Amino acid sequence: YLLMKKINLAITGCLGRMGQQIIKSARSDKNFKIVTLTENRIVNKKIVGIKPSLNTEEAFKKANLIIDFTVPKCTFEVLKIASKLKKKIVIGTTGFSKKEENLIKKYSKKIPILRAGNMSLGINLLMYLTEIASKSLGNNFLSKVFEIHHKHKKDHPSGTALMLGKGI
């Protein structure tokens, strides 16, 4: 097998549900080293031996890759810094306006960006199958996406529902 240099990760929104899951996954994979954790407020405790910081150039300097699962406002803070430092970024944040989506496309001309409303294999397979079904059925069928969430869901429709809607 190939020997790879470890990927130095910066994880934004480290106290959020997805941030916590990414930390857990990255710690269990020897190919990753978490070098930076950020949050939108001062945090006075260490997480996996790292004191979270705010989104600053200094915070992201050691990272090869930034993983962002936050909110649109924060994502653009991070994108601005990532662009300046020429850092790769994975964006799992959802809820962007059309104008914001276009701005992300502009940033993608300067730095590598991987963006998806849902990163799971199952949902991406469902997306692919939805596109096939939609093409097969044609315009003679009306398709709708319905979703139900817990009361704390921050964005609705969800990024997943929007992805499926585009596939239809």
Feature names for model-found ranges:
Residues I66-I67:
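N-terminal Rossmann-like NAD(P) cofactor-binding module of classical short-chain dehydrogenase/reductase
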Residues F76-K80, K84-L85, G92-R115, N124-A133:
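Rossmann-fold NAD(P)-binding glycine/threonine-rich loop
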Residues Y1-L3:
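Short, Lys/Arg-enriched N-terminal segments with co-localized hydrophobic residues
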Residues T12-I23:
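N-terminal Rossmann NAD(P)H-binding glycine-rich loop of SDR-like oxidoreductase domains
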Residues G13, L125-I168:
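Conserved anion/nucleotide-ligand pocket segment
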Residues R27-I47:
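NAD(P)-binding Rossmann-fold cofactor-contacting core
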Residues K5-L9:
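Extreme N-terminal starter segment of soluble prokaryotic enzymes
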